[in-house]
């Protein structure tokens, strides 16, 4: 009889879209449960217990913003789009905030690269 392997605990990784609680918040920061795209690696997230990434929203006023990546229509809501807010870069204790996978699952390579490029420009890593 083959021994059962222990279940591998879920750890979010770069490009994953997760649900996370943004509260508490202040000022113009995102609040409540929202999707969040993870930019940090699974190894970092596992060892440090934090995720670094960007908030996501469906607020239409983000359309056309140079700081928001339009991911396209939301399934079942053709008039609403999902946006990654590259200027809402945050780190969260993903376990304490009850992070869980989002139905979008992952950003495709091109969209993730766009997010990383804008974040790099904001932080001065890229020209």
Task: Name what the model sees in each region.
Residues 1-127:
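Conserved functional hotspots at enzyme active or ligand-binding sites that engage polyanionic ligands
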């Amino acid at each position: 009889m083959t021994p059962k392997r222990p279940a591998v605990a879920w750890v979010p990784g770069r490009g994953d879209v997760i649900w996370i609680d943004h509260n508490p918040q202040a000022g113009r920061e995102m609040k409540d449960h929202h999707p969040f795209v993870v930019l940090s690696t699974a190894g970092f997230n596992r060892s440090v217990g934090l995720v670094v990434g960007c908030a996501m929203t469906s607020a239409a006023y983000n359309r056309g913003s140079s700081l928001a990546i339009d991911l396209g229509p939301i399934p079942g809501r053709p008039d609403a789009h999902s946006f990654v807010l590259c200027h809402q870069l945050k780190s969260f204790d993903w376990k304490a905030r009850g992070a869980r996978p989002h139905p979008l699952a992952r950003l495709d390579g091109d969209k993730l690269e766009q997010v990383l490029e804008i974040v790099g420009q904001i932080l001065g890593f890229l020209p």
